[in-house]
């Protein structure tokens, strides 16, 4: 999709603080974070809704991997998740640590913490 901001991030036309990337999926820090380490996880192929992603099991394995990294990175037991779709018409899952440590505006530090804890 030519006007999709997430597709532009995938193509590296728009910069993003990427915390995870593989052949199928990309995870990056939200530019308007609700909390330190707030991440968007998207498929690299454009799908309108999460439920349209054919390899949804693999998608949620990535969601789990990022959530577990956030849990360690921000020293919290609670990672919130939400599936949206109205604001950007590209499948995406939000993940953010509840009551986590750190400042939400520290993009570089927050991305490094998540990357360090992804297994």
For each of these PLM feature ranges, what is it?
Residues 1-119:
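HIT superfamily nucleotide-processing domains
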């Amino acid at each position: 999709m030519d006007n999709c901001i997430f597709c532009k991030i995938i193509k590296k036309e728009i910069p993003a603080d990427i915390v995870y990337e593989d052949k199928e999926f990309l995870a990056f820090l939200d530019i308007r974070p609700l909390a330190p380490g707030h991440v968007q996880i998207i498929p690299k192929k454009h799908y309108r809704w999460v439920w349209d992603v054919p390899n949804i099991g693999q998608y949620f394995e990535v969601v789990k991997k990022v959530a577990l990294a956030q849990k360690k990175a921000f020293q919290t037991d609670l990672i919130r998740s939400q599936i949206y779709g109205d604001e950007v018409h590209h499948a995406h899952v939000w993940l953010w640590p509840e009551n986590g440590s750190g400042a939400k505006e520290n993009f570089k530090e927050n991305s490094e913490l998540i990357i360090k804890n992804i297994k």
